[in-house]
Structure formats: structure tokens, C-alpha cells
Regions:
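Short cysteine-rich clusters marking metal-coordination/redox-active sites
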Residues: 129-132, 154-157
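Short linker/helix segments within small regulatory modules
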Residues: 141-151
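Short, non-transmembrane amphipathic alpha-helical segments
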Residues: 11, 51-76
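Cys/His-enriched microdomains
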Residues: 53, 127, 152
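N-terminal presequence-like segments and adjacent domain-start helices
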Residues: 1-16
Length: 179
């Protein structure tokens, strides 16, 4: 007999194998999975957080999750729920996700925590280039290939790279390249 814990483990393993359609990492490593629950009849509810409101990949992600989780033994049905509270932030990206993004030329801000909890905040717009490590970089365009990314340019190696937009924890708005 398969236990509820065993089924939920299988569900989580399945989620870890579902890639984000726009970024080179899984939805788990990207930090989209907020919760997984199952009732006594095998109905699974998965709560996901979108990176940005209006992200065009939401339907594709929900369809992939529903299809793959529903195919698991002992799962009767799967429902996906998108919620906006708590808001997704780049702090949710796992170390494996950060490494995968960096390997593909996408930088991610360091985990910030609560910016109001410390004294002086020193900020720089210089983002380390994922290709050469130089901080001689600049914002090339606030509009990247998706709503959650910007295009940066490295003056040292003369390569462009993508950067995940930072979210303002106060109002949820994005700011391009504010490292």
C-alpha cells in the first residue's frame, strides 16, 4: 500500500522535473511551488506563485503540472491554483536554480531578506557578468525577452546577458538592474 507521504513525495519529485518554459530551471528550483496537498480520495491541490502578473507561461505551467501529476498512480485528480500572496520573489530561487540560470547567462539578485532591518543600504547598479565576473556592466534595455528579465551589457567581455528583475518588497513593482 502506498502511503500519503509516498504519494506526496512522488508529486514533489514530478514537480521538480517540470521545467519553466521561459527559464532554464524547474518550477521547484524557480520557487513557484508554494504548497502541495492531497485529500483522502487522491485529489491533489497544488498552489503556485507566478513570477509576474500576466506571465504568458502560466497556462502552460498549469497544464504541465495537471497532466504529469494526474498521470501518477494513486492520484485521482490534480488542481492547480495560482495565488499572489505571498508574492513570488527572486529570494525563492534555490541554489541549484541560481546555478542553472547563471550557467545560461541569467543573473539573479542575491537573497535580500528584509531591507528595512539593517541600517545603511549601499546599492549599486553594477551587476556581475555571468560570463567573465566583471562588474563593469550596465543596463542595456529594461525590456528583456520576458517581463521578468532585463538585458544587461558587460563592457569588459562585450557580451550581453539577462538579469532577473528585482521586486520592490513594499509595492511589488519591479526595478530593472537595481542590484
Amino acid at each position: 500500500m502506498v502511503t500519503d507521504d509516498g504519494i506526496l513525495f512522488s508529486v514533489r519529485e514530478t514537480l521538480a522535473d517540470i521545467p519553466d518554459p521561459e527559464l532554464p530551471c524547474s518550477i521547484v528550483d524557480l520557487g513557484l511551488v508554494e504548497s502541495v496537498a492531497m485529500d483522502e480520495h487522491g485529489n491533489v491541490d497544488i498552489t503556485l506563485l507566478p513570477t509576474f502578473t500576466g506571465c504568458p507561461a502560466l497556462d502552460m505551467i498549469a497544464n504541465d503540472v495537471t497532466r504529469l501529476v494526474s498521470d501518477l498512480d494513486a492520484v485521482e485528480s490534480c488542481r492547480v491554483h495560482w495565488v499572489f500572496d505571498p508574492p513570488w520573489s527572486t529570494d525563492r530561487i534555490t541554489e541549484a536554480g541560481r546555478a542553472s540560470l547563471k550557467a545560461h547567462g541569467v543573473t539573479v539578485p542575491t537573497c535580500g531578506g528584509d531591507p528595512s532591518s539593517s541600517g545603511v543600504q549601499l546599492r549599486t547598479s553594477a551587476i556581475a557578468c555571468p560570463w567573465c565576473g566583471s562588474r563593469d556592466t550596465r543596463l542595456d534595455s529594461p525590456f528583456g525577452p520576458t517581463r521578468c528579465r532585463t538585458i544587461q551589457y558587460c563592457e569588459s567581455c562585450r557580451n550581453t546577458f539577462e538579469d532577473m528583475k528585482r521586486l520592490d518588497p513594499e509595492d511589488g513593482t519591479s526595478s530593472p538592474g537595481a542590484g
